[in-house]
Amino acid sequence: MKFVSLHTHTTFSYADGFGTVEEHVDRIANLGMRALGISEHGNVNSHVALERHAKRVGIKPIFGIEAYFGPTGDKATRQKTHLGIYAMNKEGYHNLNKIVTQSYIDSYQWPTVSPATLKEHNEGILVLSGCSDSLISCTLLGGKFLGERREPSEGISDESIDKTGRRLQWFLDVFGPERFFLEVQRFPSLERTCALNAEFAVLAKEYGISLVATADVHYPRPTDNAMQAVIHAARWPSSKSDFQTETSWEYQANLSYPESDKEIIDDLVGTGLSRSEAEAAVAQTSVIADQCTVELPKAKPLRFKTSAGRTAKEQLKAEVIKGWEKRIKQRPSLSTKKKEYFTKAGQELKLINDKDFSDYFLATADLVNNAKHQNITVGPGRGSAAGSIV
């Protein structure tokens, strides 16, 4: 397949996407796609899993987000538009992380990317204009913080087209036509999509912008459609049937992968694009996949600086012995359980050492002890590590 899915959501798009990263990667591999772009809502949490499993099955990973885009820090504008942001190279991935971090600092309710943040960290980044809830889409037909959605049958006003042109020019000034694309989606059953795609085709020619096809994937298989309604209803105070009624458009569309290039090209033609426009939009996904060449930065294993030339394993064992000596002074009765104590401690130390976690335990102990010395409250901890003898 020439088509590469760039607009994809997994379970890391919380309460919206369905299917694990691994399920999505396996699905596109079976369909014959050579790459996959994942764009979770406002986070990069799936990227490590994407790289790991994509490499296993021979698929190229593309790292992005579907950002909440718009004014920040304003409670009155909580309905943010959407924007696809992707890393092209190492610098771009660092900038993508900076953008995401700043979005959580600036935002109210949703992690929102401001135009200023996007412009400041634009190097190595490419942008897709977004879905029918994007800034460009909502400028044309309303929605989100730009007012009520307008029916496509009402037409698009000259004023809306002029505003859209100014916003397109802003993106072009920042990214140029090499890094900014108009996103056309594959849903001929949705009137809004048809109206937008037709207008995007006109704007693309006027401003010299390439069209890019997406499937707005939210689940790996078409049969998973019903699960999205369940997920949405669980998130909001509605029943499944109420939610399907209130947002029926989302469940009428197949938010899954096309099974061939012909399928998505036919869908795009069904929205009003010419066949040549549809074919070019599909081919552009492959061009973008070639442009995105990111390998995630790898952290070096934590190594704790030990004393007296000891290894971390030796240091941890010494600390365990010191801890035992401290506790039998506090509670002499424990001395009768010395054999039991050291048998259990030995088992735990072997497991910790085998997993190369000695440095982690030493660093954690150093952090906790330092906090105590500065009269900073430290909780008792939870879980198997906190409850262990070590």
Model regions and ranges:
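Non-catalytic structural connector segments
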Residues: 1-2, 136-137, 144-147, 269-384
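Short conserved micro-motifs on helix faces and helix-strand junctions that flank
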Residues: 4, 37, 86, 213, ...
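Gly/Ser/Thr-rich beta-alpha loop segments that engage phosphate groups in nucleotides
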Residues: 19, 39, 385, 389
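Conserved short loop/turn motifs at secondary-structure junctions
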Residues: 38-44, 184-192, 219, 303-309, ...
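Residue-level "edge-of-site" marker
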Residues: 41, 67, 215-217, 302, ...
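Phosphate/diphosphate-binding loops
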Residues: 60-74, 79-82, 209-212, 217-224, ...
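Conserved phosphate/anionic-ligand binding catalytic regions in large, soluble enzymes, centered on
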Residues: 92, 130, 212-221, 376-390
